[in-house]
């Protein structure tokens, strides 16, 4: 089931136990981006398995890692939303008021959620959503007032289609979704195992959707791990990883033609899911990679991973620059949070 938990790609995904250690950092106001770049929300886990949430260079909060972290930030109200798991394997969706330090548990249960995004009006959280007894993931919303989930795609009746990644576009209140067939995926995996060869890539579908419907853009038979769309909706990007070669592709949303724009270079190597994301003006593309001289870290369980860096790629000049890095931990995920 190589795509069922597609967000769990980092070596830092470990059984960390109870979250006894907690540190809260009082931010007076939103932290501005440095050097004219985009504002970033970053989740990073250190060698002691403490997961910290940063708004640019400002540490908002940290606690012991209990599961792969998901997060979203309401910059106007100064609210951090994040997830954790307790010793009984119960999942929690937490609301943290960054001004008062007050925590509110919005949801507790068996459902698994990740990939949090805050709606443009701040009334909902979007996420990948998985029922405990099911194998496929859905794109869903959580109403912050009613405290209720609503499945967007695919329907709960559909047990085959699974959302492996999505991105929410605040500019037009739409989504770009990466999804595939579980049946096809298992079939290709079983065939490869029986022949003793690597599996052929499952057909990955890239679709655009809103809360009411979905339209397919293109089906691509590649090992695709993520996707994103430009603010104007004209360019879709995705990361492909195959045979130790990784690249970020840009696809024209109208013609459906695509080409590689970023690949491994002397200075860095892309990670399996580079999490590409556009700046608000669409002029820069941010992504995750490992610098060639990246420090190797070992956590308290003995697991090793290299430090990751967030880079920016100028869509006009093609220049790549470092945007965010800390050498004492591994970046789990990040979000461009330009207002």
Model-predicted regions and their roles:
Residues 7-20:
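Hydrophobic membrane-insertion alpha-helices, especially the h-region
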Residues 22, 26-61:
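An edge-strand/N-cap motif at the start of beta-rich repeat modules
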Residues 29-36, 71-79, 116-124, 166-175, ...:
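Blade-terminus and WD-like Trp-Asp/Gly-His loop motifs, strongest in beta-propeller folds
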Residues 40-44, 80-83, 124-128, 175-179, ...:
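Residue position within the beta-strands of beta-propeller blades
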Residues 52-69, 95-112, 142-163, 209-225, ...:
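Multi-bladed beta-propeller domains
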Residues 85, 130-131, 178-200, 288-306:
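Short, conserved, GDST-rich strand-edge loop motifs in beta-rich repeat architectures
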Residues 90-92, 136-138, 201-205, 245-247, ...:
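A detector of repeated loop/turn-to-beta-strand junctions in beta-rich toroidal repeat architectures
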Residues 150-152, 156-222:
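Solenoidal tandem-repeat scaffolds enriched in leucines and small polar residues
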């Amino acid at each position: 089931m190589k795509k069922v938990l597609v967000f769990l790609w980092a070596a830092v995904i470990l059984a960390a136990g109870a979250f006894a250690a907690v540190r809260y950092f009082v931010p007076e106001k939103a932290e501005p981006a440095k050097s004219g770049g985009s504002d970033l929300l970053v989740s990073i886990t250190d060698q002691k398995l403490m997961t910290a949430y940063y708004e640019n260079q400002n540490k908002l909060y940290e606690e012991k890692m209990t599961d792969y972290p998901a997060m979203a930030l309401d910059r106007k109200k100064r609210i951090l939303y994040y997830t954790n798991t307790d010793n009984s394997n119960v999942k929690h969706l937490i609301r943290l008021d960054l001004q008062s330090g007050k925590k509110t548990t919005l949801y507790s249960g068996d459902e698994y959620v990740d990939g949090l995004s805050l709606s443009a009006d701040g009334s909902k959280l979007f996420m990948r959503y998985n029922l405990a007894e099911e194998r496929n993931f859905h794109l869903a919303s959580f109403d912050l007032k009613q405290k209720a989930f609503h499945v967007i795609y695919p329907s709960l009746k559909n047990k085959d289609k699974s959302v492996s990644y999505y991105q929410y576009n605040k500019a037009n209140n739409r989504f770009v979704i990466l999804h595939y067939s579980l049946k096809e995926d298992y079939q290709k995996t079983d065939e490869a195992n029986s022949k003793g060869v690597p599996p052929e890539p499952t057909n990955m579908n890239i679709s655009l959707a809103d809360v009411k419907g979905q339209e397919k853009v293109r089906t691509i038979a590649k090992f695709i791990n993520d996707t994103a769309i430009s603010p104007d909706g004209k360019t879709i990007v995705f990361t492909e990883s195959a045979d130790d070669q990784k690249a970020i592709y840009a696809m024209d949303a109208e013609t459906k033609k695509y080409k590689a724009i970023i690949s491994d270079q002397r200075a860095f190597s892309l990670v399996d899911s580079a999490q590409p994301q556009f700046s608000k003006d669409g002029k820069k593309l941010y992504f995750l990679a490992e610098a060639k001289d990246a420090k190797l870290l070992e956590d308290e369980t003995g697991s090793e991973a290299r430090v990751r860096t967030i880079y920016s790629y100028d869509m006009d000049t093609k220049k790549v620059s470092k945007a965010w890095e800390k050498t004492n931990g591994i970046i789990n995920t990040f979000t461009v949070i330009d207002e």
